[in-house]
Amino acid sequence: MAKEKTHMNLAFIGHVDHGKSTLVGHLLLLEGAIAEQQLDEGEDKFRFVMDKLGEERERGVTIDLAHAKFETQKYEYTVVDCPGHRDFVKNMITGASQADAAVLVVAANDGIMPQTKEHIFLSRTLGINQLIIAINKMDVVDYSEDKFNELKEELGALISTVGFKPSDVPFIPVSAFEGDNISEKSSNTPWYKGNTLVQELDALDEPDKPVDLPLRLPIQDVYSITGVGTVPVGRIETGILKTAENIAFEPAGVTGEVKSIEMHHEVLDKAEPGDNVGFNVRGVGKNDIKRGDVAGTTQNPPSVAKEFKAQIVVLQHPGVMTVGYTPVFHAHTAQVACTFLSLDVKLDPATGQPKEENPDFLKTGDAALVTIKPTKPMVIENIKEIPHMGRFAIRDMGQTVAAGMCIDITDAK
């Protein structure tokens, strides 16, 4: 059997109407993931691919994360088509945080929009370290090299403020509608000497499997199976789960021995990051652990925070956030109400540099360093130590109001 290709999750980010869906649609078409007859006639034929839902067709807005798949020579990709509309930013949080790399789409005729900046900062906050920039709608600006270079310079300055090196980031002039420089070099841009989008996708670094980090396995469900015993189920974020190993569940505070591991009805000796497993634990009862607990080895158990410092971005809050505010934090499989103990420093959202000490409140668009106290102990890790376990979304009133990461645990269990 041929070795399976490495899998890569790809987020498409950028301002609404800059052509993300059209670009994804054309990419899928050119890479043979969809048949031509599936496409509508005329202007919006490629966007159809991503907008399968009726309501979306009417509004001409991409809502859902369309998990479309395509392959290149090197990778198999799942496209997380991240919506650009304001009220769909929460999708971007669940979407972008699953992504190994992002394609930022910027329209040549519009240039940098507020959302362009926001998405760059947000994707960085969510741990995306590989970026490709597609300067789209080149057909609208008559394939102007000057326009391309001007935007490339502006975008280079912008991405360097959040820690991307412009020299490491490919800038590609494309037309999502006409298909220029997507899978084949375009004769409309003879001045462009770089690679096509597909070549740059193939040149991305393989996603690291964080096997060298300590084991962290957030629990999704717990079953009790007759004749077997307690079987927690979850997806390994970091490290390796092995049979006969002693593991600790936090914040439950119980330990047990791994007797067996199963994935897709197949028995395994060990399981790696990305694997969805069920495993039988001796010495732990079904009611001792629950969704939101995290398993680690007894030598290096998960960190339980009673208080932590975080960097957050306020995405959409109808009012202001002040000290004492207690929304629900969603981290891995846990959902815990947490209180803002202090607002420490307001940051410039474009650069991450300090702007104001101890602000009175935070509002939509603000970035800040804050101190957080969970209302009950929860597992969260320092982003620098175990990045996969350090991110969270903050939800309130049925919407995602902020996203962030834990930068220090100041009081642990």
From Swiss-Prot:
Class of the enzyme per the UniProt entry, highest EC level: hydrolase
UniProt cross-references to SUPFAM superfamilies, sorted A to Z: EF-Tu/eEF-1alpha/eIF2-gamma C-terminal domain (SSF50465), P-loop containing nucleoside triphosphate hydrolases (SSF52540), Translation proteins (SSF50447)
Compartment(s) of residence: Cytoplasm
Record region (G2): 60-64
Matches recorded under Pfam families: GTP-eEF1A_C (PF22594), GTP_EFTU (PF00009), GTP_EFTU_D2 (PF03144)
UniProt cross-references to InterPro entries, sorted A to Z: EFTu-like_2, G_TR_CS, GTP-eEF1A_C, P-loop_NTPase, Small_GTP-bd, T_Tr_GTP-bd_dom, TRAFAC_GTPase_members, Transl_B-barrel_sf
Entry keyword annotation includes Lipid metabolism: no
Family designation: Belongs to the TRAFAC class translation factor GTPase superfamily. Classic translation factor GTPase family. EF-Tu/EF-1A subfamily.
General function of this protein: GTP hydrolase that promotes the GTP-dependent binding of aminoacyl-tRNA to the A-site of ribosomes during protein biosynthesis.
Identification of the protein by name: Elongation factor 1-alpha
Gene transcribed to yield this protein: tuf
